Amino acid sequence: MDSKNKYRLATDENGSPFVLNSKGSIDFGYITEEMNLPPAPIRIAEGDERYGLMHIEQRHGNQIRDNGFDTTVEFVEYVSRNFDRIMQGNRDSCLLEVTDGKHNDTLFVRLFKHQGYWKVISGGVFNIRYSKKKKEIYSGSDNRPPQPASDGEDLAPQ
């Protein structure tokens, strides 16, 4: 499948097309009010070397595949739907993390309030010490609210 078929005509503030998830939507997951942040969908644009899918693929693609994911898009969808912790990042970013005690599958997101979404800037598989000293915004390992538009499929890597 040509990669252009994985994008919608909707674009980010830089004109970069949003990537579609496995259900054909530009919304990969959601941050809800219960998470102590402004509620909005999580989206990722094709981007370039500074942000988005292209940035993650160039910097962390091999590492992501080495950790059981077939594609970077699969990794982004998995973390967006399954994060169990949110940490304060640098400046105005947040880290969405799926923790397992060995490493954290992490997405760096930033709120674009006027456009109404959380934008994936970067991501990768990091040592658990990476975010240890960052401020925790949300922990939902036992009380995660249901994710809108989820069909209950487990997107864990095989």
Where are these regions (language model features)?
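Ribonuclease/tRNase effector modules and their secretory precursors
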Residues: 1-158
